[in-house]
Amino acid sequence: MFSLYNRFTTQGTLSDPDEVPDPRFALPSTVNWMRALSILVQDRGLNFGSASSFYAGTQRRVGTAQEENTIFEQLLFAVHQLSALEALRASPSKADVARVGIVGWYYGIYSAASAMIAAQDGSIQDDHTGTATTWDRQFAANNKVMAPFFYRLSTLVRKDFEVEVDTLRAGNGFLLTEKATDATEAFGACCSYLSGSADWWKWKTEQNLKSSREFKVLNVSDFRTKAARTLRDVRLTGKSTAFLHQAFRYRGKANYREALFLGYGKSTETLLDGYPDDLAIVLRGFVAMAGAFVAKRIGQPLWDEFLDDIERNRSFSLSPKTVWQ
C-alpha cells in the first residue's frame, strides 16, 4: 500500500537523501514547549501592566525620527501578527493553521524584539541571528527580560552548558515528551527545550566551522583531534542561547521540516488541541512586554500618539489597546 510516511522515512528525498526525520517524535515537543510557555505567561501574569512595572526604572532615550519610525514599524508588524494568531484560534481545524501559526508567531516575536533593540540603541540588525544575539546581549544577559522569556545559557560548549542546565533545573526533571499541566512542569519543559536548542546551535556552529579556512588547515573531517576540539571550543565559548535563539530554531519547524510534519497523520489534530491558543497567548505576552519597554524608552506622550494612530487607522481586527494599555 502506498504510504508517504514509509516512503519519506525509509527512502528520503532530494533534500534529505538518507531519510527524513520521523515527525512522530518531533511534533509532541513542538506542541509541548508552546504549552509550557503559555502556562508560564499566564501563571506570571505577564501583561502590559506588569511589564510597565518591571520596566519602571527605564530611562527615556531621544532618538531620531527614523529610529522612532523603525520602532513603530516593528511594533505594528508584531501586533498585526498577533491579530492573525487571534483569528487563527477560531479555526475548527488546528492542523489547517498550525504551520502558518508558527510562522506568524515567530515573526511577531522577531519584530517585537527588533523594536526593543531599536528603542534601546537606535539600531536594527541585518539578519535573524544578529537580532537574536543583540537582543540577548542587551536584554536577557542584563536581566531586562521577564519570565518565561529570560531563560538563557552562556555557552555552547556542551560540558559547560549542561552544568548550567542542571543548575537552572534545580532537580526539576520534567521533559518535553509530556504536556505540562502546571507551572512547575512547564518550567521543566522550558529547561528541556533550552538544552535542546543549545545542542542545535552547537551543531549549527560546528557545521559552519567545518567550512572555515582555520578548520580546513587542520586537514581533518571531524573534531576528534585535540587541535580540532580546541578550535571548536574557542568558537563555542561565549556563544549564548536565549529566547530568540530558541524562537529561530522553532520557526524552522514550519519553514524547513518535511511535509509530513504538521500535515500528515490522523493523530495530528488531537495533538494540536489548544495549540493556536497557546501560540497567541505566548505572543501576546512577549508583545506586551516589548511595548512596555518601548513606552518607557520613548516617553508617554509619543507612545500615546502612536497607539491612538494605530487604533484609528488599523486594517486588522485586534485593538492594540487590548495589548498595550
Task: Go through the PLM ranges and name each one.
Residues 1-325:
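Terminal alpha-helical segments
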